[in-house]
């Protein structure tokens, strides 16, 4: 990457930080992590120049990276702290995984695609991030053997409340997932565990892919 590219990415990053602050995100730790993790490291070469654009970017295995502003709003809503254990369903490019790792104690991330899991591991190793556990499993099924978590982020959408995953939350834990019809508009929803009950708040509308059951046999 040339000096011109570096300067351009820095300008785009600074502009985005100002924009997100106008949306209510004003966490110094959050922006420090965002500046530390180069998003262009997580996109393929044809999309390198679009790394900081607010648009969907295709990745391997027919998957995609969500719009950048959506990613940042969701991660900010998790209110991550250094002591937290985080579970992510849907590793994807690994960009959000890396960001969360900078802001928490440990991130366990799972994906159904071997290719995405292996690529993510390589990227984390290159960046020197050591507090991420990457597993290739069927994320649509509850992973009780992993224990409880302070934060859970589920990228695939679903049509109903994620009750089985909510039970994995520790006290005062937060889970975020898009809830709504597979083929329609969904609502990114934030659940907070308070004792034996869960408070629910709606964030914004999206169109995310639903869960695909099973582990990919080829990719």
Region annotations inferred by a language model:
Residues 79-199:
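Conserved nucleotide-cofactor-binding alpha/beta core module
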Residues 1-88, 95-99, 103, 116-130, ...:
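Class I SAM-dependent transferase core
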């Amino acid at each position: 990457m040339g000096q011109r590219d570096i300067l351009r990415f820095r300008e785009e990053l600074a502009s985005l930080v100002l924009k997100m602050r106008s949306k209510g995100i004003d966490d110094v730790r959050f922006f420090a992590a965002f500046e530390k993790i180069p998003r262009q490291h997580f996109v393929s070469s044809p999309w390198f120049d679009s790394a900081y654009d607010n648009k969907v970017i295709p990745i391997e295995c027919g998957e995609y990276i969500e719009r950048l502003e959506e990613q940042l709003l969701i991660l900010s809503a998790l209110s991550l702290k250094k002591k937290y254990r985080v579970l992510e369903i849907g590793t994807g490019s690994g960009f959000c995984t890396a960001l969360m790792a900078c802001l928490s104690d440990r991130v366990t991330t799972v994906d159904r695609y071997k290719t995405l899991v292996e690529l993510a591991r390589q990227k984390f190793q290159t960046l020197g991030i050591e507090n991420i556990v990457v597993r290739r499993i069927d994320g649509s099924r509850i992973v009780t053997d992993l224990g409880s978590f302070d934060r859970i982020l589920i990228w695939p959408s679903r049509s109903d409340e994620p009750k089985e995953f909510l039970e994995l939350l520790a006290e005062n834990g937060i889970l975020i997932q898009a809830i709504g019809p597979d083929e329609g508009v969904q609502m990114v929803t934030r659940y907070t565990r308070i004792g034996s009950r869960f408070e629910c708040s709606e964030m914004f509308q999206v169109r995310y892919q639903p869960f695909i059951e099973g582990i990919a046999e080829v990719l």
